[in-house]
Amino acid sequence: MNALKNFFIWAIIIGAAIVAFNLFEGKREFTTKVSLNEVVKLVEEGKVSYAEVRGNTAIIQTKDGQKLEVTLPPNTNLVDKMVEKGVRVEVANPEPPGGWLVNVFLSWLPILFFIGIWIFLLRQMSGGGNVNRAFNFGKSRAKVYIEEKPKVTFKDVAGIEEVKEEVKEIIEYLKDPVKFQKLGGRPPKGVLLYGEPGVGKTLLAKAIAGEAHVPFISVSGSDFVEMFVGVGAARVRDLFETAKKHAPCIIFIDEIDAVGRARGAIPVGGGHDEREQTLNQLLVEMDGFDTSDGIIVIAATNRPDILDPALLRPGRFDRQIFIPKPDVRGRYEILKVHARNKKLAKDVDLEFVARATPGFTGADLENLLNEAALLAARKGKEEITMEEIEEALDRITMGLERKGMTISPKEKEKIAIHEAGHALMGLVSDDDDKVHKISIIPRGMALGVTQQLPIEDKHIYDKKDLYNKILVLLGGRAAEEVFFGKDGITTGAENDLQRATDLAYRMVSMWGMSDKVGPIAIRRVANPFLGGMTTAVDTSPDLLREIDEEVKRIITEQYEKAKAIVEEYKEPLKAVVKKLLEKETITCEEFVEVFKLYGIELKDKCKKEELFDKDRKSEENKELKSEEVKEEVV
């Protein structure tokens, strides 16, 4: 319907333009202006056939059809001469009353017409609605929450307790500024929240406003700069004027890197000067208001490294707070928050879900429970069970199941052997990521998956950890070669080889884990004109060759080790593959049970230590120790 309406509007506009063009072009007479002397000469030579006099202008037509225009001076006898020579002379009727108004209107009509088209296009670009909106270029597009203040509080923010403590003094200042002013202190003018996408930067800003019970003014960094020059700076001024009217309040600028990118001599991308003007105005405004005005600026970004240093100096964004991804305890608390409005069955173990989601942010966890709720609703269930949560987790981490994909029995066997090789390495090595389940059901881009879950969150890795990870990655390829020979290896190990090589390269060139190369790191720089591609600098060809040799040595050693392990456990591995082909998905416990039939014990390889139980035990031990100390004191 809207498309048809727009078609008719444009058809009318184009039609009106054609009519106006024909109207004005039709009224024009194409004549050549000449001097009075030339006309007199033509009259005397008898070359003029017709003349039309319009006030002080005469249109002369020669016998050869040429039209000439001449301006007649007062009291001229040119008309009498033309009559004497037999020229037909006509005098146009005098202009009717109001004719000059018509002429003025007709002369201005094209200009008014195109102004109307321009206004129409501006209204279309601004989304219609208010007629004046198209001209409010300099007005800020910030959303102001005054009566409807953010309902989010610190109860809705979990997993970042240290960050919450850090921002509580901002809330106290907004509630009672006199308390700080008595001691001569001032709160930070600006707070920069930075971290990976989804960690809760925007949610935390809303919670601060909700706890302080003050107006919340929200704007995106991309709302400042548009197609018109000077609009960004004007919108920054209007934003702070709006904030002063509603003080005390919080200004929240999301994705500030869109406008706060570091200034430089080399413009990268278009609109460079306009963006710098907007940034300069933002710097001036943040210097121009005093903390006694009751305005706190909170900004969020995923890229603090590209922000202008002038924006980050004390006096503007005094406090910079990093919001990390939640650890296992934080994920558990976040899951509890998002589970408040969900109907969970009794079998749902949020502690297990927290342990099974390393690297997940708050947004990821919310999406996980939402996906589980949708799956439960699709199945017609009244509650969300652990089955739906695990299925949702598999969909997010590994992709959708492609059960309808046709795979030949021979290919299926190779996939099963490949995945069994991965699982075997994970079980016999000292890798901290324990095997959870093995599946040969195609998911996403993968034809099979071996899922591993970490026992605990790790922040640093030693050389042994990295060797074990490379061993697990090469386990699938090693199993293929042992079972089918060198000519039977497949393309299924492409991603495994890439990840293993990248890990080995980092060990040698970044983390100094090679005895031959030594504890050095290759300096690398990114070129902004090549899409951020990094290149090594100040590195000799000999050193690069040594690095390549060490990477190859690490990969080769771990690959040979993986093949030896597969050879050692070849018979029980065949039985595992057979079971995997029958069931398509098996758990770690089922894998271990098959090995037990061959007299091989993989003790505690599937046991996942309960971090939460460890935490509880440590808390109990602390309480016991404190009670013992009290008794000793008494």
Curated annotation (Swiss-Prot):
GO cellular component: plasma membrane
Keywords: ATP-binding, Cell inner membrane, Cell membrane, Hydrolase, Membrane, Metal-binding, Metalloprotease, Nucleotide-binding, Protease, Transmembrane, Transmembrane helix, Zinc
A GO biological-process term: protein catabolic process
NCBIfam families from the UniProt entry: FtsH_fam
Residues binding Zn(2+): H418, H422, D496
SUPFAM superfamilies: FtsH protease domain-like, P-loop containing nucleoside triphosphate hydrolases
HAMAP family in alphabetical order: FtsH
Organism domain of life: Bacteria
Gene: ftsH
Reported function: Acts as a processive, ATP-dependent zinc metallopeptidase for both cytoplasmic and membrane proteins. Plays a role in the quality control of integral membrane proteins.
Topological type in the membrane: Multi-pass membrane protein
UniProt organism field: Aquifex aeolicus (strain VF5)
InterPro entries for this protein: AAA+_ATPase (IPR003593), AAA_lid_3 (IPR041569), ATPase_AAA_core (IPR003959), ATPase_AAA_CS (IPR003960), FtsH (IPR005936), P-loop_NTPase (IPR027417), Pept_M41_FtsH_extracell (IPR011546), Peptidase_M41 (IPR000642)
Name this protein carries in UniProt: ATP-dependent zinc metalloprotease FtsH
Active site: E419
Cofactor annotation comment: Binds 1 zinc ion per subunit.
